[in-house]
Amino acid sequence: MVRRVLAFVDRPCERFEEAAAFWTAVTGTRLSPRRGDDGEFATLLPESGDAWVKIQAVGDGGGAHLDLEVGDVRAAVARAEALGAAVAADHGDWAVLRSREGRAFCLVSGEVPGEVPGEVSVGGTTSARRPPVFAGTRLDQVCLDIAPGAYEEEVAFWAALTGWSPRPGSLPEFTVLAAPGMPVRILLQRLGEGPGRSAHVDLACADPEAARALHERHGAAFVARGRRWIVMRDPAGGIYCLTERDPET
């Protein structure tokens, strides 16, 4: 069973400090102490709620990936393999896998000490508290960019792996996976062309243009305008989107 979904902002090692400064500024968070063998991991810590957004220094490229926090990593790995995933690296209490399309994700066992999520009991069920809206925005979504020929299979894989029911998005090329009490949702996007296997984070914005102005003041750059979103590039070169959605819902 998936207990939490964690969003990782992946940025090149040499741009980590720039990326961390930007993302803490535009989300109203502070950076945790760095951890990992090479100090490659850190968490964006909100004033309240569940710390579910992480940042990772990577060797090249960038983008985003998902970590699924589960109660039993061994059982979760076996289930993922049965659904068609392949293990890329097994570290015992956590593992790196690839989806049927070849998209990397991790299965992990629990929280980092000192970063226990805020939780509330609703009707006897434990659920995570969402971090507060900051400057009219909330980072609440990871978008998986999927090649046209792999789309249906990838949607089925992620729905089965998370146990979340898919529902149509705002446009025909979108499918949403979300669950009550989870601070993050997954958006699966069918690309018009291209290899897929990429991912980026999205922010829900009450006013995307106001959010764009704020982000540009912190060093981001405008890339393109979509039907209901603005594509941006952060100071470390990573792509993300400001989407026209209510950050309170």
Regions found by a protein language model. Name each.
Residues T24-V26, V70, A85, P113-G114, ...:
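General N-terminal targeting signals
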Residues M1-A20, A64-L66, V108-A156, L161, ...:
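N-terminal beta-strand motif that seeds the catalytic metal site of vicinal oxygen chelate
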Residues T27-A64, A104-E111, W164-A199, P235, ...:
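Conserved short beta-strand elements that form part of the metal-binding/catalytic scaffold
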Residues M1-A51, A75-A76, A82, A88, ...:
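Core segments of cupin and vicinal oxygen chelate
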Residues G59-E101, H200-I239, E244:
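Vicinal oxygen chelate
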Residues S32, G114, G118, V122, ...:
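Intrinsically disordered, low-complexity, compositionally biased regions/tails
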Residues C13, G71, R100-G102, E111-V112, ...:
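Short loop segments at secondary-structure junctions
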Residues L45, V87, G92, P132-F134, ...:
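Generic marker of residues within folded, mature protein domains
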